[in-house]
Amino acid sequence: MKLLTASALAGAAALALLASAGAASAQDVAVTANIGVTSDYVFRGFSQSNEDPAVQGGVDITVGSSFYAGVWASNVDFGDNTEAEIDVYGGFRGEAKGYNWDVGLITYLYAPGANQDYDYVELKAAVSRAIGPVTAGVAGYYSPDFFGADKGAFYGELNASYATPVTGLSVSGAVGEQWLNVSDDYATWNLGATYAFAGTPLSLDVRYTDTDVDSPAIPTSDGRVFATLKATF
């Protein structure tokens, strides 16, 4: 049932994208693509690749000034036969009185699909504000049927970034809390720097992440430093 629901929502998002794209003129549609490699695919403090490297990539489309949608994929390793994660997402973003807002839906699908409880959907809402070189924001993600369970979950996050005087170099970090209805809640945080190489599509992000999960049985939640090299076209 989770797979059918997630697939249906992904299809609805795709139809909405096509409808919006059809209503817009060609110059209102922008398409970008990205591909990258990371030393460890980390999501909310947990390694999704069993602390091994991952290859990732996606395509994004923006229609007009507000509607966006895209698809993104990465290899994963949960110690079973699951090999890939595919995210399909869409939403609307805009600006009001100096605040940037973003509301959307993200569908997480896992292949080859033997573990259908992995698939889930999240509703997203985020607000941020830029003051000079500093941008601060808050975001919330709610899933009625979270990863690996049949229960709801909520993730809340405070984040900030700083565009340094060095051209192309920014520093960013976030503190979040994952509330789970099937197990203990946990906190996670990260801090890192991103450098965009001038005249190229390349950027390099180096980041430290950790959680307050203290269990030898869950080594994928330990503190770690990982690096991601990405090209955006």
Predicted segments, located by residue:
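Outer-membrane beta-barrel architecture
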Residues: 58-60, 89-91, 124-128, 157-161, ...
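Cleavable N-terminal export/targeting peptides
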Residues: 1-30
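Residues that define the transmembrane beta-barrel architecture of outer-membrane proteins
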Residues: 29, 51-55, 82-86, 99, ...
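Transmembrane beta-strands of outer-membrane beta-barrel pores
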Residues: 37-43, 73-77, 94-96, 107-111, ...
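Repeated loop/turn-to-beta-strand initiation elements of outer-membrane beta-barrel proteins
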Residues: 31, 65-71, 98-103, 132-138, ...
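Surface-exposed loop and membrane-interface regions of Gram-negative outer-membrane beta-barrel proteins
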Residues: 47, 67-96, 101-117
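Short glycine/proline- and aromatic-enriched beta-strand/turn motifs that initiate or cap beta-hairpins
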Residues: 26-77
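Outer-membrane beta-barrel "beta-signal"
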Residues: 191, 195-197, 219-233
